[in-house]
Swiss-Prot record:
Entry GO CC: cytoplasm
Primary role: Member of the two-component regulatory system LytS/LytT that probably regulates genes involved in cell wall metabolism.
Alphabetical list of SMART domains matching this protein: LytTR (SM00850), REC (SM00448)
Subcellular location: Cytoplasm
Domain of life: Bacteria
Gene from which the chain derives: lytT
Name the record gives this protein: Sensory transduction protein LytT
The HTH LytTR-type domain, residue ranges: 137-241
The UniProt record lists the keyword Protein biosynthesis: no
InterPro entries assigned to the protein according to its UniProt record, in alphabetical order: CheY-like_superfamily, LytR-like, LytTR_DNA-bd_dom, Sig_transdc_resp-reg_receiver
């Protein structure tokens, strides 16, 4: 994996270069302090993974990110910056991750492993399935924002404005309302079963009768989700059970 680090601070570049180079997947690390120098490096090295700061010596990191959108094969883009307020904007220009300074070894490892996995699973364009993909959902973590594919979500629940998004064996937490995230989820994939629950219909394993004419849904990950009386009719209709 060829890595390019674009940052106008020499010490930050040096630190990140050291952390990145500790991983066996990384075969080379190049550095640049400006958009112009970064473009030269990209023409020469064609990096697989790009760590990009926001404030550079000539233009903004977003200017470079915008240029990447026009490339036939853009590098795996990770913003690495001291500013947390630009995270949502970063994902709008196709960033895969957003990490904050000072850098932590564990987070760099997560980025490298995630990038390696995605590159290893890449399918040539002429053999890839052409089915439509849902837009990833940004989820605000403690110190970073995660992008989660809707089809990977099993369940979303809310309690006192605290959202829990269940993805495989992991649970992401964020502040918000169920309605706010429901609007971002594809209606063909998700069903609201209760004022506090939305589930992915493709993750349903079993539906059981419950008390007072309600239902209980068992998901493939073992989660149990109630279907309240006011949602039973709509739930059955969406599954073709009525």
């Amino acid at each position: 994996m060829h890595v390019l680090i674009v940052d106008d601070e020499p010490l930050a570049r040096e630190e990140l270069s050291y952390l990145v180079s500790q991983h066996p997947q990384v075969t080379s690390v190049a550095e640049a302090d400006s958009v112009a120098e970064a473009m030269e490096e990209m023409m020469d090295q064609k990096p697989d993974l790009l760590f990009l700061d926001i404030h550079l010596t000539d233009e903004s990191g977003f200017d470079l990110a915008e240029k990447l959108t026009h490339l036939k094969k853009a590098p795996y883009l990770v913003f690495a910056t001291a500013y947390d307020q630009y995270a949502l904007k970063a994902f709008q220009v196709n960033a895969k991750d957003y990490i904050l300074k000072p850098f932590e070894e564990e987070k760099i490892t997560q980025v490298i492993e995630k990038a390696s996995k995605e590159m290893g699973q890449a399918v040539p364009e002429n053999t890839a399935e052409k089915g439509p993909k849902s837009e990833a959902i940004p989820i605000q973590g403690e110190d970073r924002i995660y992008l989660v594919a809707p089809e990977d979500i099993y369940l979303v629940s809310v309690e006192e404005r605290q959202l829990s998004i269940f993805v495989d064996q992991q649970v992401y937490k964020m502040t918000g309302t169920l309605n706010s995230i429901e609007q971002k989820l594809p209606a063909t994939l998700f069903i609201k079963t209760h004022r506090s629950f939305i589930l992915n219909r493709t993750k349903i394993q079993e539906i059981q009768p419950w008390f007072n004419n309600t239902l209980q849904v068992i998901l493939t990950n073992g989660s149990k989700v109630p279907v309240s009386r006011s949602y039973v009719k709509e739930f059955k209709e969406k599954l073709g059970l009525s």
